[in-house]
């Protein structure tokens, strides 16, 4: 409210639908609805997955991450950084604007990508086992057109993942091995190497756009760039 935005208290009916004690909501400058809650109801029954998996990495790291697409990155960054208090992890300006934010030790829990469109780009869920991701990839490939980005590994958070289309028009990223950082010592910085070491072929883009991302991956391969063998050592030494 101090920044000029309207904040609304949710009625009891909505709190009951969300299974939370209290809830407030507002819109970001792009009109995306944000909900904040406390006192969630805790399930007493153990989680039963839809297929045999080892589980999801959540707890103190949250559920994963969410990414929105926007034509006005410069408008959204101050809101999430200065109003909500999210901390910038890193950012890229080319070939498209990308900003990543952390709120805990997960490299990023929120991000935004420059786009002509607005709305949700994707949600990421992190599995406890790489085999969970690989087996899910096999299953997704049984459905024609389901894969939106092939299996690959990201350069900033080291996540090995693939992306799938959803009926609602956004993507789901299924990943493993995401990077943890030290919030007290981390310094935000610009990256220019591209989003992936290998893979993540964006099947939904034009041939020209795909060539741009592929050239960046091939440059990394030529230069011998890869994720560190020991992310913990990298974290404590401050190397990137």
Q: How should each PLM-predicted stretch be described?
A:
Residues 68-108, 113:
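Core segments of cupin and vicinal oxygen chelate
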């Amino acid at each position: 409210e101090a920044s000029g935005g309207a904040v609304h208290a949710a009625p009891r009916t909505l709190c009951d639908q969300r299974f939370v004690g209290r809830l407030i909501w507002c819109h970001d400058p792009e009109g995306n609805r944000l909900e904040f809650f406390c006192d969630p109801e805790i399930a007493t029954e153990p989680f039963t997955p839809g297929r045999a998996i080892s589980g999801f990495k959540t707890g103190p790291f949250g559920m994963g991450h969410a990414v929105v697409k926007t034509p006005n990155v410069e408008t959204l960054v101050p809101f999430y950084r200065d109003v909500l208090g999210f901390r910038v992890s890193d950012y890229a300006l080319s070939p498209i604007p990308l900003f990543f934010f952390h709120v805990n030790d997960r490299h990023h829990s929120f991000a935004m990508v420059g786009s002509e469109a607005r709305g949700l780009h994707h949600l990421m869920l992190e599995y406890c086992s790489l085999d969970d991701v690989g087996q899910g990839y096999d299953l997704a490939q049984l459905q024609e057109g389901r894969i939106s980005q092939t299996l690959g590994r990201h350069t900033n958070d080291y996540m090995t993942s693939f992306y799938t289309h959803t009926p609602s028009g956004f993507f789901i990223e299924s990943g493993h091995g995401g990077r943890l950082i030290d919030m007290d010592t981390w310094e935000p910085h610009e990256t220019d190497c591209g989003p992936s070491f290998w893979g993540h072929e964006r099947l939904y883009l034009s041939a020209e756009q795909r060539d741009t991302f592929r050239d960046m991956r091939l440059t990394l391969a030529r230069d011998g760039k890869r994720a560190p063998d020991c992310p913990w050592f990298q974290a404590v030494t401050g190397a990137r």
